[in-house]
Design a protein with these regions (language model features):
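Junction motif at the cytosolic side of a transmembrane helix
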Residues: 2-10, 207, 211, 272-295
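Secretory targeting signals
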Residues: 3-21, 52, 56-106, 136-202, ...
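Membrane-interface helix starts
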Residues: 35-51
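Transmembrane helix segments
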Residues: 57-67, 212-248
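Hydrophobic/aromatic residues in alpha-helical transmembrane segments
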Residues: 104-108, 156, 204, 224, ...
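Transmembrane helix boundary and interhelical loop/hinge segments in multi-pass membrane proteins
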Residues: 105-123, 139, 293-295
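A structural motif at transmembrane helix-loop-helix junctions in multipass membrane proteins
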Residues: 111, 187-226
Length: 295
């Protein structure tokens, strides 16, 4: 069922004679129907299950493995056994590079291109729903989807981590310790920071989704954009470009685990995310507002 079908079912008697409701009511109904559509797709449910499985597998692997000498891996992995909250942090560090962007690619590909591909976009616009409002709802649903994706990693990771490795004071990257309640709050801040980064990437995906009627093509294009961004970020000769890459400061979420928090990179990262969100949403709006809906 598409968003158009869901919206029509929610208001079957809508017509010219129906009393006009306040502007925010249909917008809220459309958002709810869009979220139900996103949450109800089996592909999305399977994707969330895969995201949630990674921290569980990591925690079990660390639990059953023999302790050995520290290697060159992230500090989060070496600290997992000391506090279960390092499990979601380590899992987020792994999944933010590929799995979470892949999830956002699939969601953003379905946003506009998916509706056009199955022939419901034109009907959705005759409900009536203004194109600008529709695009805002689509992007807001992608932002909520980003939070869902990050939570699908962090929440199971925290639960399995606490169950296997316990709680207690968390040793920050600065070397001192903070109580468990403060540590949970730091994990929440990390979740919000990474969700903001994925929301910036989702704006790029939404723009790409307005350029085609093939959702798979839109998803692949966004993944190519993400991979190229990571590659460019790893090339020292392109240092002048690094501050402008949406992925450049994603891994700076470690600064939120220092005491006190080092906010310079985090603030810069949020500003870059906001810039991507504004610029690419406006590009999507410019394209979508003039798009000839033929399907």
């Amino acid at each position: 069922m598409s968003a158009a079908d869901t919206l029509a079912a929610a208001d079957p008697a809508a017509g010219p004679s129906t009393r006009r409701a306040p502007a925010w009511v249909p917008s809220t109904r459309l958002l709810r129907s869009e979220l139900r559509l996103v949450a109800g797709r089996r592909r999305n449910q399977a994707g969330l299950a895969v995201l949630a499985a990674v921290p569980i597998v990591m925690a079990i692997a660390v639990k059953v493995s023999r302790p050995g000498a520290a290697g060159d891996g992230p500090d989060f992995f070496g600290s997992i056994t000391s506090n279960g909250l390092f499990v979601p942090l380590a899992a987020l560090g792994v999944e933010i590079t590929m799995f979470l962007p892949l999830a956002m690619s699939m969601l953003s590909g379905d946003a506009i291109a998916g509706e056009a591909n199955i022939g419901t976009l034109r009907y959705l616009l005759t409900v009536p729903v203004h194109r600008t409002r529709l695009l805002l709802v689509k992007y807001l649903s992608l932002c909520i989807g980003a939070v869902w994706g990050v939570a699908a990693v962090a929440v199971p990771g925290a639960l399995i981590g606490v169950a296997l490795f316990g709680t207690g004071q968390l040793t920050t990257l600065s070397g001192d310790q903070i109580p468990f309640g403060a540590a949970v709050w730091r994990v929440v801040l990390v979740m919000l920071y990474l969700s903001a980064g994925l929301a910036g990437l989702a704006a790029v995906g939404l723009f790409i989704s307005t350029l085609t009627e093939q959702p798979i093509a839109a998803a692949i294009a966004l993944m190519i954009f993400t991979i190229v961004s990571w590659i460019a970020d790893s090339v020292p000769q392109l240092g002048w470009l690094h501050p402008w890459l949406v992925v450049h400061l994603w891994l700076s979420f470690g600064d939120l685990l220092r005491n006190p928090i080092e906010g310079a990179n985090v603030t810069q990262g949020l500003l870059v995310d906001l810039g991507y969100a504004v610029v690419f949403w406006l590009l999507a709006w410019a394209r979508f507002s003039e798009k000839d809906i033929t399907s």
